[in-house]
Amino acid sequence: MALPKYKMSRANTRTRRSTWKAKAAQTITCPNCGAPTLAHVACPSCGSYRGRVYREAIRSAHTK
């Protein structure tokens, strides 16, 4: 197992760790219905993706 030869300073450690973080999910507005949705994923409101309907929209249990 590799071991560091020199002690890493606090500034260098924090600089290195600052790039290792989670990114926020990229959301876009659906051009069909205007609801926010994840990029490259079918819209959960209307079920369309790139102008085509791929699946039925997810409906809540109390809506009929």
Curated annotation (Swiss-Prot):
Coiled coil: none annotated. One of its GO terms (cellular component) is large ribosomal subunit. One of its GO terms (molecular function) is structural constituent of ribosome. Residues 1-20 are annotated as: Disordered. One of its GO terms (biological process) is translation. It comes from the Bacteria. InterPro entries: Ribosomal_bL32, Ribosomal_bL32_bact, Ribosomal_zn-bd. Keywords: Ribonucleoprotein, Ribosomal protein. PANTHER family: 50S RIBOSOMAL PROTEIN L32, LARGE RIBOSOMAL SUBUNIT PROTEIN BL32. Belongs to the bacterial ribosomal protein bL32 family. This is Large ribosomal subunit protein bL32.
